[in-house]
UniProtKB/Swiss-Prot annotation:
Subunit and partners: Part of the 30S ribosomal subunit. Interacts with proteins S7 and S18. Binds to IF-3.
Protein name: Small ribosomal subunit protein uS11
Claim: Glycosyltransferase is one of the keywords in the record: no
Segments traversing the membrane: none
Organism: Borreliella burgdorferi (strain ATCC 35210 / DSM 4680 / CIP 102532 / B31) (Borrelia burgdorferi)
């Protein structure tokens, strides 16, 4: 009897989405980039901590750039050419993440700042005295 080799690997489904959303959450400690389609279904994500940056290095602009490039390289097979960028948070990785999207070769259609602004809601954290 001949032994039959079976492969249980799934084939990659190549979808042609064309247009998507990129959400950049830039906090003081980390940067998280999520790529979704127009309906809001998440396709890929990456964070500075997941990319190997630890401690204070997570909040650098270079870490945000590498994170954005990694998240967009994951969705290269989906055929996304145009993106809408939504930025949330006060972190310093905001601008460098947007520049990384442009350097990858994707066309940025719009940039929106969706940082939540309180109308005198919760009491803020105490100011640091260094």
């Amino acid at each position: 009897m001949s032994a039959k080799l079976s492969t249980n690997s799934k084939k990659k489904i190549k979808r042609n989405i064309g247009e998507g959303n990129v959400y950049i959450q830039a906090t003081f400690n980390n940067t998280i980039v999520t790529v979704s389609d127009i309906k809001g279904n998440a396709l890929a994500w990456a964070s500075a901590g997941g990319m190997g940056f630890k401690g204070a290095k997570k909040s650098t602009p270079y870490a945000a750039q590498i994170t954005a490039e990694s998240a967009l390289n994951k969705v290269r097979d989906f055929g996304i050419n145009y993106v809408h960028v939504y930025i949330k948070g006060p972190g310093i990785g905001r601008e460098s993440a947007i520049r990384a999207i442009g350097s990858i070769g994707m066309t940025v259609k719009s940039i929106s700042d969706i940082t939540p602004i309180p109308h005198n809601g919760c009491r803020p954290k105490k100011t640091r005295r260094v």
